Amino acid sequence: MKKIIVATKNKGKAKEFKEFFASFDIEAISLLDLPESIPDIEETGTTFEENAALKAEQISERFNTAVIADDSGLLIDALDGRPGLYSARYAGEPTNDQANIEKVLKEMQDVPDNDRSARFICVLAIAQPGKETNFCTGYCEGHIHSKQKGDHGFGYDPIFIPKKYDVTMAELDPAKKNQISHRKNAIDQLEKWLHTI
């Protein structure tokens, strides 16, 4: 079985990547699975692409192997695209999903239902030694619910209702969520690069 490093320490993302890559007969190894401690890579980029590339390229260089990294976030139209690049730490450091959700709900409390459109974005960077870094981008369109619902998933899943559904991502069965998520949509595009790994 082929192996690929996924440059994340986020347990939720690591679990999703492992499930996605298993269908391609590829073992996804997260930074949490490695025997050595990897310091956090500072996300100093000004775009999702730059942040994903920073992580993928640094880890690829360190281990001299193919690495996939993602940078993802929630873009809310009524908040001019916030939390955007700062989705994980929207309420400040250290990162806290509950605090982030509460901040978004507070900022959205007076926004009418028809103005609550939002989308998740996932940008994947594929870095390999001696090769140009490639990118795949996936989206999941939907809107922001007025309150939290559900206990599956992570991040903003309890307040995000995907298009064509009437429940939040956190209320969906994890297998169903993985079929429609922004990460899955990005990974679907990634398939064309997998033969080069």
UniProtKB/Swiss-Prot annotation:
Mg(2+) binds at E42, D71. The keyword Metal-binding applies. The keyword Ligase does not apply. Its cofactor is Mg(2+). Substrate binds at T8, K9, N10, K11, G12, K13, S72, F154, G155, Y156, D157, K177, H182, R183. GO terms for molecular function: dITP diphosphatase activity; ITP diphosphatase activity; metal ion binding; nucleotide binding; ribonucleoside triphosphate phosphatase activity; XTP diphosphatase activity. Keywords: Hydrolase, Magnesium, Metal-binding, Nucleotide metabolism, Nucleotide-binding. Binds 1 Mg(2+) ion per subunit. It catalyses: XTP + H2O = XMP + diphosphate + H(+); dITP + H2O = dIMP + diphosphate + H(+); ITP + H2O = IMP + diphosphate + H(+). Homodimer. This is dITP/XTP pyrophosphatase. It comes from Oceanobacillus iheyensis (strain DSM 14371 / CIP 107618 / JCM 11309 / KCTC 3954 / HTE831).
